[in-house]
């Protein structure tokens, strides 16, 4: 299950009471989603950062909401990720652009949770290309073994095995700066509303590959423009996406190139 719930930082959501309402709203889904998961299934949740209204102070609402969801569902926190958007616009405007007393906020929290301590996962499915230095090392089979300043001890042959790629970190980089893609072109052509807070495709693709195998079912209960469904479709996973706003459902058809498939999204 991959989910990006409605933002905790929405302009209409300012003040403690509304923040508490958001936290409780999110946490109430935890036991419901737990019933839908297989015992070794996973939930991946992305939540943006929040600022206190009228002050250059960050709110702990995002972390509090994740903690409350974790607690109410009795989930295990398998790993925390950071999604870093290196091309994000500066903001909040007053504190970053006008008064210049803060730096731009360029990341979101992503928590991977599961009812199990050992959910289905394999980092072999999400390996990244080796660096030029690593490729040279594999070719020359020569490096300096021994103890490092970090107290790690590197063996004589520790880096000689070719694993076909490097293990990725828990920091995922992406940009959402493209002015043209199939989804945006489809929205323009059919005069449809573009979703304003689309999940990055490579984020959804990473977790679908990491946590599932072909044929498994992926659910996104807050689908928006259905990035998760499109990623699952490309990776030959079954998928179900839920979205209450019909205009976003209509625009999501642009993510699916086959006309026959798109007709099923109603």
Locate the predicted segments by residue.
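Core catalytic lobe of class I
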Residues: 1-251, 257-258
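S-adenosyl-L-methionine
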Residues: 257-266
């Amino acid at each position: 299950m991959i989910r990006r719930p409605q933002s905790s930082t929405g302009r209409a959501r300012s003040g403690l009471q509304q923040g508490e309402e958001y936290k409780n709203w999110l946490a109430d889904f935890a036991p419901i989603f737990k019933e839908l998961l297989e015992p070794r299934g996973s939930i991946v949740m992305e939540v943006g950062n929040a600022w206190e209204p009228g002050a250059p102070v960050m709110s702990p609402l995002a972390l509090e909401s994740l903690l409350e969801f974790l607690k109410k569902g009795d989930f295990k926190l398998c790993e925390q990720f950071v999604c870093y958007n290196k091309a994000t616009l500066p903001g909040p405007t007053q504190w970053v652009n006008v008064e210049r007393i803060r730096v731009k906020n360029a990341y979101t929290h992503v928590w991977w949770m599961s009812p199990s301590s050992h959910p289905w996962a394999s980092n072999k499915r999400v390996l990244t290309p080796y660096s030029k230095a690593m490729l040279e090392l594999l070719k020359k089979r020569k490096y300096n073994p021994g103890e490092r300043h970090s107290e790690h001890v590197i063996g004589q042959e520790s880096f000689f095995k070719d694993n076909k790629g490097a293990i990725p970190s828990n920091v995922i980089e992406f940009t959402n700066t493209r002015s043209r893609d199939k989804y945006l072109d489809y929205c323009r052509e059919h005069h449809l509303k573009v979703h304003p807070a689309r999940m990055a495709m490579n984020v959804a693709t990473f977790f679908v590959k990491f946590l599932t195998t072909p044929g498994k079912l992926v659910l996104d209960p807050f689908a928006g423009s259905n990035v998760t469904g499109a990623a699952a479709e490309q990776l030959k996973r079954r998928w179900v996406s839920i979205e209450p706003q019909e205009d976003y459902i209509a625009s999501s058809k642009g993510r699916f190139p086959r006309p026959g498939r798109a007709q099923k999204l109603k």
